[in-house]
């Protein structure tokens, strides 16, 4: 049969497939087929994937060292709401390995409540092709206890190794600076005790590795040499074990900043043929010497010094005060130093002297300087006696001084290490320590390079108010006097009781 030309065909459109559903066995709501035969809402209500995870736990905290116990026997520093504290808390939850941890964060609590709350989000496959995600809170109780290291500090003779640091000089300015470096880098955190002796400091450690770490730290900041020894305490032949105590004797080079030194001839030639009569300008991992007549400098390694040791020719107590009458710059410079001819007037008798100095860039007529007056000083030094008289200047200028009108109450302060003081300290020693400490504070104010290795903290508000009052009472204040700006000071968080 022929189709009419005007008729139109109808296209076949298949119907959309209808997904099969089942009725939920709990509430009767149609739901896609699954192994539980329940809808998602009923699965969430009847299935708890966190049933094996405890909602409460305990973490051990040491009051002395502020460390938390990390199972099984480790103790670590973990500030509040830190990643380290979160790791400690999660390791306390036994059933956490049965689920997949998606998120974990702290819930704020009062610091004094001794509670730590953590919100966890986990996932787990409850049935075939059915993954559930739930969030819940876990509360940890902070159990204040005492770690083994802190417990040993209250027991005598518990140290395993000791570092005995010594320097054969008549002052303790080096140890004052070393104390601030140790505080800045927290190198004393592993000590069980620190004792101050007449000519040094003893650091006691519970482990030998901590003592070795201290020796390495000291060698990186001051020129030293050390010698190790061990003492047998007990021995067990059955188990083939022995108990030793280790001692590290550390000696710092007896050369300090601003000391006048006469180098042996062989040592001077080995260091760029520098002049034998030099001034020590810096003490660090190496010793830096400067020739004040030529501005030539050299750095000496501690190993070279101990190979041919030599004493300081003169130190700070032997400095004499002079007044600058005239300064004539010669032109040569070396960093912050500038060579100049200076005419000086001795403060005690008014005699005039001509000398050459490396401090021409900061000296002006009328300034006061401290210098070694070699023309009237006798030295008991064999190397110095071999020098030619025409190579020895009358006066060697070391540093510029400032009027002593500075306020006693400074707007900054230093922290100290809580160490056990030496016994039977004489009154003279106490007065000398106070003078050394005041001189150390003045050096910090005058030397910006020295302040880089020290943490300076803001003084309490009362001290600052008293200092401002003292400054108001002064008629005139020399602007040339070095002062420490507030930008260099740190806030003392411990003093704020945060």
From Swiss-Prot:
Assigned keywords, A-Z: Cytoplasm, Nucleus, Protein transport, Transport
Keyword Manganese belongs to the record: no
GO process terms (BP): protein transport; ribosomal large subunit export from nucleus
Subcellular location: Cytoplasm; Nucleus, Nucleoplasm
Molecular-function annotations in GO: protein-macromolecule adaptor activity; ribosomal large subunit binding
Superkingdom assignment: Eukaryota
GO cellular component labels: cytoplasm; cytosol; nucleoplasm; nucleus
Family of the protein in this entry: Belongs to the NMD3 family.
Entry function: Acts as an adapter for the XPO1/CRM1-mediated export of the 60S ribosomal subunit.
Self-association and partners: Associates with the 60S ribosomal subunit.
Protein name according to UniProt: 60S ribosomal export protein nmd3
